[in-house]
Design a protein with these regions (language model features):
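A structure-centric signal for secondary-structure junctions around beta-strands
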Residues: 43, 194-195
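Extracytoplasmic thiol/disulfide redox context detector
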Residues: 2-92, 115, 125, 184, ...
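A cytosolic small-molecule/anion-sensing beta-strand core signal
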Residues: 50, 200-201
């Protein structure tokens, strides 16, 4: 038996799997602050505009996350860019938290808040008038901290390895808030109608706001 040859073939297979896994795990931050998952030099770039208070965005993430990343991103032929279209103060607070800390933490922060959206949006719908008043008065940092307290964001971030001072630093990061505002302004400038919305290689996909429709577009182009 040719054990060296068999071992070499097995090693090649393992290296191929590792390479595919590396593309799926690769995350790059663009100059605008958006996050690019996969091969940054991929021939095709899919851009997703996301709002954390958008229920359709949470639905899309549940339906599309695995097939999109494991089928399309893993190959290295397509990269996924996540940009923010901030539509309200809660959305801004969550976006600041998903972007909190090292870039490597973004994707799981992003997924955690989307998967738990029903719980924290449910809390937002049942807060008292006094609590809501804290969200709209005082310095921006104090307003965001009040939201984080009332909606359970400190506990969510603690489970992700952040202590309260680290969360407070991110909620006070006005440079980050400005980058998120710039991404939102860019979305408005190019005519993004709402979230989720998608671009392929910079071209806005009209009428494409769910996984079924997007998947058909991807199959037609790749």
């Amino acid at each position: 038996m040719h054990f060296p040859k068999i071992a070499a073939l097995a090693l090649c297979a393992l290296l191929a799997i590792a390479a595919r896994g590396d593309w799926n795990a690769r995350l790059t931050v663009s100059p605008s602050g958006s996050h690019i998952i996969g091969n940054p030099a991929a021939a095709t770039r899919l851009t997703e505009y996301i709002s954390y208070t958008c229920s359709h965005c949470a639905d899309f993430d549940r339906q599309a996350s695995d097939p999109l990343r494991l089928v399309y991103v893993t190959s290295g032929k397509l990269s996924l860019e996540i940009r923010h279209l901030v539509r309200d103060p809660i959305d801004l607070a969550v976006a600041m938290l998903t972007n909190c800390g090292p870039p490597a933490k973004f994707l799981q922060n992003h997924t955690t808040f989307l998967r738990q959206q029903a719980q924290w949006l449910g809390r937002a719908g049942s807060v008292s008038p006094g609590q809501k008043a804290r969200w709209s008065s005082g310095p921006a940092m104090a307003r965001r901290r009040a939201m984080a307290d009332d909606l359970g964001f400190y506990q969510t971030m603690q489970a992700r390895g952040y202590d309260r001072p680290a969360v407070d630093r991110c909620l006070a990061d006005e440079a980050m808030a400005s980058r998120l505002a710039e991404q939102t302004d860019e979305a408005v400038r190019i005519g993004v109608p709402g979230t989720p919305s998608f671009l392929i290689d910079g071209e806005l996909l009209t009428g494409t706001h769910d996984w079924q429709t997007l998947q058909a577009q991807l199959k037609a182009r790749l």
